């Protein structure tokens, strides 16, 4: 994970990771000199960025607390260069590796659990068996649209 791409040095990576925990945010995205902090739960921020600001993800370094397969798909589709996760699921790690996204993590788990810790993350379940980021994106889109309708 020590590549120096897009002007993102190891020191800048460390700053993004430190900020992730200091600010108690969901993710920090570093792209060149631009560093932005996000607070939405789940994949909402990554999904919005992919749809509305894809340039921020392209070639970026992303520090994220939890990366499941759905988040990994969004990062791969966005052209993310590298991700550092506190916790990553094995399916997410496999998908990122298949899509040449550099990956570092503290803990790799079989799957991501839901917010109430009573089962699996619903998006992790929806992405089971899917092979491509595009297939996962369709599930993420459906999930987000369903959540909006149900309010």
Where are these regions (language model features)?
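Conserved mixed alpha/beta catalytic, RNA-binding, or beta-rich assembly cores of soluble enzyme
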Residues: 7-86, 108, 113-122, 126
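C-terminal binding/interaction regions
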Residues: 78-81, 91-151
């Amino acid at each position: 994970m020590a590549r120096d791409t897009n002007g993102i040095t190891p020191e800048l990576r460390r700053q993004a990771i430190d900020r992730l925990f200091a600010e108690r945010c969901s993710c920090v995205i570093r792209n060149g000199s631009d560093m932005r902090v996000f607070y939405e739960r789940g994949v909402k921020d990554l999904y919005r960025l992919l749809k509305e600001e894809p340039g921020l993800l392209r070639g970026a370094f992303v520090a994220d607390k939890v990366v499941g397969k759905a988040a990994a798909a969004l990062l791969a589709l966005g052209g993310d260069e590298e991700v550092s996760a506190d916790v990553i699921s094995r399916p997410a790690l496999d998908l990122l590796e298949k899509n040449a996204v550099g990956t570092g993590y503290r803990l790799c788990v079989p799957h991501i659990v839901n917010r109430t810790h009573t089962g699996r993350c619903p998006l992790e379940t929806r992405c089971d068996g899917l092979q491509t980021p595009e297939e996962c994106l369709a599930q993420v889109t459906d999930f987000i649209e369903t959540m909006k309708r149900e309010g």
